[in-house]
Amino acid sequence: AACYSSDCRVKCVAMGFSSGKCINSKCKCYK
């Protein structure tokens, strides 16, 4: 599955993280 930075960021923010980005096609969230 492809990882889209915008979708990842929205998903992470919705879970209470400050941001997120794609690394090796996986969404990683940041505090």
From Swiss-Prot:
Which residues does this entry assign to the site Basic residue of the functional dyad? Answer: 21
Disulfide pairs?
Answer: 3-22, 8-27, 12-29
Q: Where in the cell is it found?
A: Secreted
Distribution of this protein across tissues and organs: Expressed by the venom gland.
Per its UniProt record, what PROSITE patterns does this chain match? Answer: SCORP_SHORT_TOXIN
Write down any Gene Ontology CC term.
Answer: extracellular region
Predominant place of localization: secreted
Keyword Chloroplast attached: no
The answer to whether keyword Metal-binding applies is no
Q: Which InterPro entries match?
A: Scorpion_toxin-like_sf (IPR036574), Scorpion_toxinS_K_inh (IPR001947)
Annotated Gene Ontology MF terms? ion channel inhibitor activity; potassium channel regulator activity; toxin activity
Keywords linked to the UniProt accession: Calcium-activated potassium channel impairing toxin, Disulfide bond, Ion channel impairing toxin, Neurotoxin, Potassium channel impairing toxin, Secreted, Toxin
The site feature described as Aromatic residue of the functional dyad is recorded at 30
Protein origin, superkingdom = Eukaryota
> What is this protein for, i.e. what is its function?
Selective inhibitor of high conductance calcium-activated potassium channels KCa1.1/KCNMA1. May be insect specific.
The entry assigns this protein to a family as follows: Belongs to the short scorpion toxin superfamily. Potassium channel inhibitor family. Alpha-KTx 19 subfamily.
Q: How does it assemble?
A: Monomer.
The molecule here is called: Potassium channel toxin alpha-KTx 19.1
Output the lineage of the source organism. Answer: Eukaryota, Metazoa, Ecdysozoa, Arthropoda, Chelicerata
